[in-house]
Amino acid sequence: MYMSTDEIRRAFLAFFESKGHQIVESSSLVPANDPTLLFTNAGMNQFKDTFLGIEKRSYTRATTAQRCVRAGGKHNDLENVGFTARHHTFFEMLGNFSFGDYFKQDAIKYAWEFLTDVLGLPQDRLLVTIYETDDEAFDIWNKEMGIPADRIVRIGDNKGAPYASDNFWQMGDTGPCGPCSEIFYDHGEHIWGGRPGTPEEDGDRFIEIWNNVFMQFNRQADGTMEPLPKPSVDTGMGIERIAAIMQGVHSNYEIDIFQTLIKKSAEVIGYEDLSNQSLRVVADHIRSCAFLIVDGVMPSNEGRGYVLRRIIRRAVRHGNKLGASGAFFYKLVGPLAEIMGTAGDELKKRQALVEKILKIEEDNFGRTLDRGLTILNDALDNLSGKELDGETVFKLYDTYGFPADLTNDVARERDFTIDEEGFNNAMEAQRQRAREAGKFGVDYNESIKVDVNTEFCGYTGTAAQSSIVALYRDGEAVDSILAGEDALIILDNTPFYAESGGQCGDAGVLTAENTVFNVSDTQKFGAAIGHQGSLVQGALNVGDKLEAQVDVVRRTAITLNHSATHLLHSALRNLLGEHVAQKGSLVKPDALRFDFSNLEAVKPEQLREIERVVNEQIRLNHSIDTNIMDIESAKQKGAMALFGEKYDDEVRVLSMGEFSTELCGGIHAKNTGDIGLFKITSEGGIAAGIRRIEAVTGAAAIDALHAQEALLSETASIVKSDAASVATKVSALLAHSKQLEKDIQQLQDKLAAQESAGLLDQAKEINGVKVLITQLDGADNKALRGMLDEIKNKLGSGIVVLGNVSGDKVGLIVGVTKDLTGKVKAGELVNMVAQQVGGKGGGRPDMAQAGGTDAAALPAALESVTPWLTEKL
């Protein structure tokens, strides 16, 4: 039974919805609040905190069709993409999950039912693996599902340590783990390969299609396995693999999605042979590149942005290899959005932005691609061995933008390898970090864990009666603290807002009888809220009751700035376009910062219009309303979600009239009029395609305007003008200054010509060559260059060495007429002199310049020229 990829996706989600599972949308390819991951690479990523017990959800069963990327960091399939049947940078993982609900029996039953009943796969084509000692799973497969024992393969510890097995899954060195059961499809005897667990298992006959992970243990630091009180299930099935089976093909690249993209790639490149592997590379890479951009990643030279840039450039190089002329890659975005079906809805909304970013990146790389490939191929032609040195690989990266894996691709096609260690050493030596997967690593166990759910009551007030449920000093739990000690206090309820969504944490004071604790910051620790600060007087113990009082003045300033960011966000989208998406923010008492996606700098006139629109909304004094609703209703209302944030099923929707509607858990003003005034203080770029606006509100905005007025008044006074005419007066002064500089230069040129005529008499001959060596103090470098050209022209043939001292700086310039550059190079001569005055320089064979810092050494350095030239001439 043939099924399209989109039909399989729909059938899978509908099947598990019928089994009581909540359909959860694919999360962003940029993991939310998880620094341990470069990209989302599995369906369980968005549920990680739920499996760890840190986060609770309103459902215990879930199903997803998760977009994933594996390129960079630990999970890097990039170099194999296009050269094997099943490696991809982008793939979709179908999954069903149980959070302490059903376990092995139902997980296995559901998988079997979907594969055999819904998809209609023949049972004799399916084979399963289990962990060697998992008799429970064996009995379920054998006795309940009816799988013959000879089609159930036990896999033991095949990775050199206890529980180190292909069929035992673990999140890390410690934490949730358990056995897994994989389902394989047998493509038939006509394809080479052996069953799992045999030496031939890497063949293509038996292909894993579904993995069921049974999380039933909590691994301790000493290696012991403690049973989890509520075992869970995590499963994953690659949609491309099951689509190949349902469409009667063997390679993933033969399924409907890839065939469409391969044909479109050939069309835009102008290439006819659809079997070429480079077309596979292009077809795969457009998927990862397009969806990474949709999820907020922009091409750059670090982190996630650099991985995206590497993938784009690899695709462009393969298109170039097939004869592509001009930009072609961006033309595949439209076909991709159509063939992805329901999974392409978000891409359709942002198609124009994705196309624009890809075209700019492709055009930029195209300027250096041909030159870089020429250098690379020349280097390979001249190799005596089979390995390209790391310095050349680094030069291609540094000068021509060739990622090392792109260079490796070209080398591999010609049966060469690259010196990766040498490349990495060159990168380290120049302190350049192209790939830093390590910086995304963090140990969950290192953070403070508190099994407490602090009730937040700060939406309706700034004071509350609370009790201490935990105390931490230097990261360690303690029972009490004394005056003078810094600590973290966890309360049962609090009006203090913990830093989240860009809004900084509250400050204030916790008090009891004869006891004062100053709170400097408030942070989240799981579901607990921690108050960081110091005990000024008294002592505090776990269980003590106290009064929590937020700094109201500071809180009010923060709320004004936070509400202003919402107005700014909407103004940017209205004026610049819907491609604008928030990439980060910081809301402090004294200012706000807002980062957003935009390919170009915001023009001054656009900034003025943004300010005008925001201030207009402030004057309209909209009521700022909050409503709690389910996430789907919020989206239907048009509420904007913030980049990098995770949301519960029920969300807080904040509205400012019809102008702004966003999901937000922060604290805001009551009315937009409370903001008073909004003033932008700066705009600039912080990364490729990411801009930053900084602004102030209220009293701080008035202060900023006063500061500008004072500066304008001071400038007017300096130029002897009134404020209204200062621009005209400054323009006139600059024009006058420019004319004076021109007049001075003309005079200097005349003086140089006159002086150079007199200097010709000082020229001497060394072995038949005219040589002029002299020091001219007071002349600047520009004057020296003019004199050099004048003297060289009058000499006809000869060598000129001029030096000057200006303050404590030495200037040197050397000229060699072209008939003598075969004997004397200007750069070599100027460096010989420069080294003696504490400097260095360079230039062409006929003209070179240098600088130095040892003015006293200049006379002796110039005297050394004569013997040096005597040897050369």
Swiss-Prot record:
Its cofactor is Zn(2+). SMART domains: tRNA_SAD. It is found in: Cytoplasm. One of its GO terms (biological process) is negative regulation of DNA-templated transcription. GO terms for molecular function: alanine-tRNA ligase activity; aminoacyl-tRNA deacylase activity; ATP binding; tRNA binding; zinc ion binding. Transmembrane segments: none annotated. It comes from the Bacteria. Belongs to the class-II aminoacyl-tRNA synthetase family. Catalyzes the attachment of alanine to tRNA(Ala) in a two-step reaction: alanine is first activated by ATP to form Ala-AMP and then transferred to the acceptor end of tRNA(Ala). Also edits incorrectly charged Ser-tRNA(Ala) and Gly-tRNA(Ala) via its editing domain. This is Alanine--tRNA ligase. It comes from Photobacterium profundum (strain SS9).
